[in-house]
Amino acid sequence: MENFKKEKVSFWQRLAALALAAALALGLAACDAAAVVPAPSVSTAQPAGETQSDSFQMHFLDVGQALSVLVECDGQYMLYDGGNVDDGSYVVSYLQGQGIEELQYVFCSHAHEDHVGGLAAVLSYFPANHVYSPVTEASTKCFRDFVKYTQQQGLSVEVPAVGTVWQLGSATVTMLGPVAQYSETNDTSIVLRVDYGSTSFLLTGDMEADAERDLVNSGANLKADVLQVGHHGSSTSTSYVFLNAVLPEMGVISCGVNNKYGHPHEETLSILRDAGADVYRTDLQGAIVIGSDGQNYTVRTEKQASDAQLNPTDPAASGTAQQTYIGNVNSKKFHLPTCPNLPAEKNQILFSSYDEAAAAGYTPCSTCIKE
């Protein structure tokens, strides 16, 4: 397993990189009728996460064109999504391989099979303290099975509110979104921020550009070291404005090998490159385990892949980049990201171009923008 230590890069280094980036334009799987996969015995080799000394680890399981993320801290465990129905046995086996006997929290990010499908198998095997989802009902069999196995534990599927905070050992988990009601299921994805010491992680499910924009404008603290790249790297997610607010050092993409959707899309890889974010991909590297000591983090992967394979986009494509601007919602002035007079984060709104800011009724700051 590849293993190396990642030192945190300064916020301003990442902001300077993304400030010159291009503003890019912004596969749903139908639920299967298959039965819940019985919990198997542990037989497959698992990533050697158990050998890491870090008391915090985040595992991106290799569930193909789907998502499943295990978070562990101080002997407590949280599962965010369970992949497809057919991934259920693998997810159960992986959790067994980590020595897990109980899950503190189980989250279904949203009601699509490639996120909820494997959770029924998980809940049929592991007791959970709380189970969360943005909805309590959906028309698909895989979601009904998820509810059924939750209820068999004497639990109800809970719909959490934005601002809810959970403790997972000494880590803090905060629900940031969705901040509005959406007709598009992907945009209903539960967005979680996980903080451990000074390291931070953002889980976004399949959240797309509209919900991303609303989340940015809500004033939520989105800056994070590690971003779970939304919707498997689709160009419908990871909008320029959103990535400018997160400024991750690392973006993790969970997608299937040679998947029919073409994920991750070139547009997404390009903007991640522009932001200076290292890209990790389950389709090329298998399961990915990030460990943190509260200051820095280590990254371990099942398989090795070169940077050119992980992000094959052309660095020269950034040459036609447009400037990003930060507006002050109170003064109605907009600034360069390097301006010394930036407003407090809660009063910021992001614009991907000068014209966009002007069209919104904002005027340029005379200190940082010379006309």
Report each predicted region and the residues it spans.
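Compact, charge-rich alpha-helical regulatory domains located at protein termini
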Residues: 340-371
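Sec-dependent N-terminal signal peptides of Gram-positive bacterial secreted proteins and lipoproteins
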Residues: 9-34
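Hydrophilic extracytoplasmic domains
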Residues: 290, 322, 355-359
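SH3-family beta-barrel domains
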Residues: 316-332
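Non-globular, low-confidence helical/coil segments that flank catalytic cores
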Residues: 2-6, 28-321, 341, 347, ...
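Short aromatic-glycine-(Arg/Gly/Cys) micro-motifs in beta-strand/loop hairpins
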Residues: 328-344
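A broad, structural micro-motif
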Residues: 126, 334, 351-352
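Residue-level signal for mature regions of secreted extracellular proteins and peptides
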Residues: 24, 332, 358-361
